Structure formats: C-alpha cells, structure tokens
C-alpha cells in the first residue's frame, strides 16, 4: 500500500474532526455561542463532503474505523490494510483535536469538553448503542449507495450525499448521543482530554451499524455480476 493512501485517510479524518470540533467550540458561550446544532451539523457534513471528493479516488475515503470495518466484513479491504487505515484515522482525529485545543480558549475547550460526543443525561447505555447503530447504518447505506454500487457512482454525488447523511444524522441524533457515528471522531478528543466516559459505546454502536448496513447492501441490494 502506498503511503499516500494512509496520508489521505489521515487528512480526510482531520478535515472532518477539525471542522466538527471547531464548530462545537465556536458555539460555546466562551467564544460567542453562535450557530448551534444546525451549524455543527453543516460543519461535519460539508467537511466530509469535501474530503470524500478530494480523497475518494486515493483511499476510498473511509475516514472512519466503523466504515473500514464494514468494508472488511464485505471483503473490500484486507485485515492488514484495515488496521493501517484505522491507525491513520485515529492519528488524524487526534491531530485535529489537539489543533482545536491549541487554537480555542481553554474555557471553550472545558465548556464543550473538546467536542467529545456524549449522551444526554437521560440516555441509557442501550439508547446510546441503539441510536449510534441506526445513525451509522444510515451513513453506511449512503456510502454503499453513492460510492460503492456502480449504479450510484453514475450519479456522481458521492461526497455530497454522504456529507448530507452525516448532517441529517447529527440533526436527528445529536441531542441524544452527540451523533458520533465514527469511533475516530470520539477517540481524538477523548485522548486529548483524557475523558473516557462512555467511550466504548461509541465503538460498539457505530461498528455494529456499519457492518449490518454493509452486509445488507452487499448481499441484498447490490447487483452481483454473473459468474
């Protein structure tokens, strides 16, 4: 595997996490409190759209350990390459979180806990896992439909469609779980902050959702080429 592939995964994950964390910190009272949930959703969605279009032809534009695991489950990436992808994604997310921690005031970082996706106070463990499964399932279906399935590729909206899915997932699920859908997005700020509460749930839910969606699309929806 060429180094540029892993660099693309690093940079694409950096795009997503820097924009997302930055938007959350910008919405704090310490910075100005503007934007709110809609701005946060748009920041994540637009950044991912650009990153997918920029790097999709290089690495496939996973930028998410759950997506990589779904591709592994359907034989679209080898186990060794999947591990390398995930390490690159975690490094990109951590670099983005560190950059945001250095740029924004410490009061904003503390107020938003560096943008770590966390559940509402009333949400149970089952709610967190269930919502993250649903949100990531929808994201992975969008990825397969626009970037994997040749019938979707012909429409040429892959990055835009995937980014919009992340945006509406955040609008729908953000108030419940923080709408991570991406273990790297959770890992980066958690590592910088040393805050691991609920962290495991943000691996389990997205990975289950992504693998389920990948298997459903691969075995039920995707047209198989005749042998």
Go through each PLM region and give its residues.
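Membrane-interface helix-loop junctions and terminal tails of multi-pass membrane proteins
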Residues: 1-227
């Amino acid at each position: 595997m060429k180094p540029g592939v892993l660099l693309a995964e690093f940079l694409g994950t950096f795009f997503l996490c820097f924009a997302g964390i930055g938007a959350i910190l910008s919405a704090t009272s310490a910075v100005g409190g503007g934007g709110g949930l809609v701005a946060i959703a748009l920041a994540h969605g637009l950044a991912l759209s650009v990153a997918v279009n920029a790097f999709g032809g290089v690495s496939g534009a996973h930028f998410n350990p759950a997506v990589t695991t779904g591709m592994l489950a359907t034989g679209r990436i080898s186990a060794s390459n999947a591990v390398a992808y995930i390490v690159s994604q975690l490094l990109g997310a951590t670099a983005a979180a560190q950059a945001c921690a250095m740029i924004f005031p410490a009061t904003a970082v503390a107020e938003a806990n560096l943008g770590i996706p966390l559940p509402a106070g009333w949400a149970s463990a089952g709610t967190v896992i269930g919502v993250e499964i649903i949100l990531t399932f929808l994201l992975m279906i969008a990825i397969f439909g626009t970037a994997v399935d040749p019938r979707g590729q012909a429409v040429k909206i892959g990055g835009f469609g995937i980014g919009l899915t992340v945006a509406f997932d955040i609008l729908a699920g953000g108030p419940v779980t923080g709408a991570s859908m991406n273990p790297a997005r959770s890992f980066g700020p958690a590592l910088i902050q040393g805050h691991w509460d609920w962290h495991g749930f943000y691996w389990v839910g997205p990975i289950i959702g992504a693998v389920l969606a990948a298997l459903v699309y691969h075995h039920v929806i995707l047209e198989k080429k005749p042998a």
